[in-house]
Design a protein with these regions (language model features):
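N-terminal activation segment of mature serine protease catalytic domains
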Residues: 2-48, 58, 104-107
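Serine endopeptidase catalytic core focused on the charge-relay Asp
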Residues: 26-40, 54-55, 62-126
Length: 126
């Protein structure tokens, strides 16, 4: 250390480390690769609560999904890194675009998840 710099130390309990590990695993589960209309990108799953309803959503860059003029009947290919496999995700026609902003390049799309992938949504609850 130069010039009397101080290092702040924080003691962490084992139970806190285990919780961090569990949170990190959940973050990894929610991340995915997206293929749609000859475009690729990344995204992650979030679960929103609006008017006491659970909404399962995919969050990605706006330019990934708008280039193909996405429609409510469309299917997006998703690759789950931890599961090492591609799955197809259907868009929810009622809630298809919940939020988007061209300036910050973000889109949140309502989707219809199969029961076997709902476990990937519990990370970013807003």
């Amino acid at each position: 250390m130069e010039g009397g710099e101080r290092i702040n130390e924080v003691k962490i309990k084992n139970s806190e480390i285990k919780q961090i590990d569990l949170n990190l695993v959940q973050v990894c589960k929610s991340i995915c690769k997206i293929k749609y209309s000859n475009r690729c990108g990344t995204g992650f799953f979030i679960k929103l609560y609006l008017d006491d309803k659970e909404l399962y959503c995919l969050m990605t860059n706006h330019h990934i999904v708008t280039g193909g003029n996405i429609e409510s009947k469309d299917i997006i290919d998703i690759y789950f890194n931890l599961e090492k496999e591609w799955k197809k995700i259907k868009l929810d026609s009622d809630k298809r675009f919940i939020i988007y902003d061209i300036d910050i390049d973000i889109t949140i799309i309502g989707i219809i998840p199969e029961d076997n992938i709902k476990k990937n949504f519990f990370c970013y609850q807003i």
